[in-house]
Every structure is written in C-alpha cells, then in structure tokens.
C-alpha cells in the first residue's frame, strides 16, 4: 500500500479537502496509532496497527489524524480537548482511541498456590519456592502451571 496516496484519498473522500504534506510509517510508535506534527504538518502512522488490526481500523486512525491536520490549518481547535475536534471526529467516524494491539512479546503468567491456605499467586517471573513462602500463612508454595518457553 502506498501510504501517501492512501491518506490523500481518505482526505478527499471523507473531508473534501486535499492533503498536501508528508506521511510516513514510524515503527517506534508503541501505544498510539498515529501522530500529527503541527510544526511541519506531516503525519506518522504505526505500521503494527495496520498489520494486526486491519484496514478498517487503520482508516479510522487516518481519519483521526486528518482531523488534527485539517483543523490546525483552518485555525480551529485541533487538540483532543477541543469541541471542534470532537465534533469533526464524530462526523467522519474516526477512532478516539486505538484498540490495544495483541502483544506478541508478553510471557504467560506462572501460577503458584499455597499448600496450606490455597492462596493463589500469579507472577511473570519464577519464584524460588525453597526460599519464599505464602504471605498469608507462611505455607509452602507450589507451582501449578509451567508455561512452555
């Protein structure tokens, strides 16, 4: 997909206005779908959102960033808190927040249980069961599930 052409097309179809600045992918974006830079007018987009969430969600994120873009160059309120932004975003059916991405590097939790009081503990890291005990009754801990590494 040619990103610049796609953003120009969305801008014309959904806003009736031309997009004349630069667009690029930014792999460093983690928790956001895109960014608008008022200083030079360019847009950055997160390629992981397009790859993992699909074209429909990505189009709504493009609309969101184009709301910032067009409102800024019209001299209206372009920030999330501004009424102009909220109204335009609603009118073009853009996303307010990007859905959370499936995290590929998250490790499965290890589950421990106290042998005395049956208290359960979830941990990301392994616990040395010879050294550590239950926080409630001081009973021995037992590893219930061992995820495949």
Swiss-Prot record:
Alphabetical GO biological process terms = response to stress
Q: Which stretches make up the SprT-like domain?
A: 5-143
Where the protein is mainly located, per its record?
cytoplasm
Q: Which cofactor does it need?
A: Zn(2+)
Q: Which residues form the active site?
A: 65
Task: Give a yes or no for keyword Transcription in this entry.
Answer: no
Q: Which residues form a coiled coil?
A: none
An example of a Pfam family matching this protein is: Zn_ribbon_SprT
Name where it's found.
Answer: Cytoplasm
Q: How is the cofactor bound?
A: Binds 1 zinc ion.
Q: What's a single GO MF annotation on this record?
A: zinc ion binding
- Keyword tags: Cytoplasm, Metal-binding, Zinc
> What name does this protein carry?
Protein SprT-like
Which organism is this protein's natural source?
A: Streptococcus pneumoniae (strain ATCC BAA-255 / R6)
């Amino acid at each position: 997909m040619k990103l610049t052409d796609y953003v120009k097309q969305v801008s014309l179809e959904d806003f009736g206005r031309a997009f004349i600045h630069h667009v690029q992918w930014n792999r460093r974006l983690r928790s956001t779908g895109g960014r608008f830079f008022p200083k030079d007018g360019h847009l950055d987009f997160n390629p992981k959102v397009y790859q993992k969430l699909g074209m429909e969600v990505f189009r709504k994120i493009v609309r969101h960033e184009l709301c910032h873009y067009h409102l800024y160059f019209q001299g209206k309120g372009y920030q999330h808190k501004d009424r102009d932004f909220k109204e335009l975003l609603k009118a073009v059916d853009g996303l307010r927040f990007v859905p959370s991405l499936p995290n590929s590097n998250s490790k499965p939790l290890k589950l421990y249980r106290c042998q005395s009081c049956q208290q359960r503990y979830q941990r990301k890291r392994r616990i040395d069961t010879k050294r550590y005990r239950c926080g409630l009754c001081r009973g021995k801990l037992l590893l219930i599930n061992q995820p495949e590494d």
